[in-house]
Amino acid sequence: MSKKTSPSMDSWLKEAKAHESAPKIGMYLTHNGIVRESAKAKVRQGAADTRPVVGMQFSYNQEAVDAIIAETYKLDGIFYIKVWLNEGELSVGDDIMYVLIGGDIRPNVIDALQNLVGKIKNEMVQEVKIAG
């Protein structure tokens, strides 16, 4: 499995603004997760004994991702969602994920983005970091 070509966020936004839900939307938020060289343990727990990350093996369960997207549409004020996930062997700087969410007001869209990205990252993907 090899990594995919990243999408164009400009194209995504153009598509979203042409979608039938666009008149209800007052805000779009995007997320672009990338492979970083600092290990999660170093960033989140301050672990000093971690080696730099040089890449990762990344995979996901599409059915589970589709289910959480459907669940996110049930949140108040959310009218548009698009998700792209990479796969395969990724290097530092490679895109892992793009998410675009459109909704009525800022609090609803921010909450939905945090919820969706958190569930995808914590429950639906498999990341195996490759240390240098």
Q: Where are each of the predicted segments found?
A:
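N-terminal, polar/charged subdomain of small-to-medium soluble alpha/beta proteins
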Residues: 1-95, 102-132
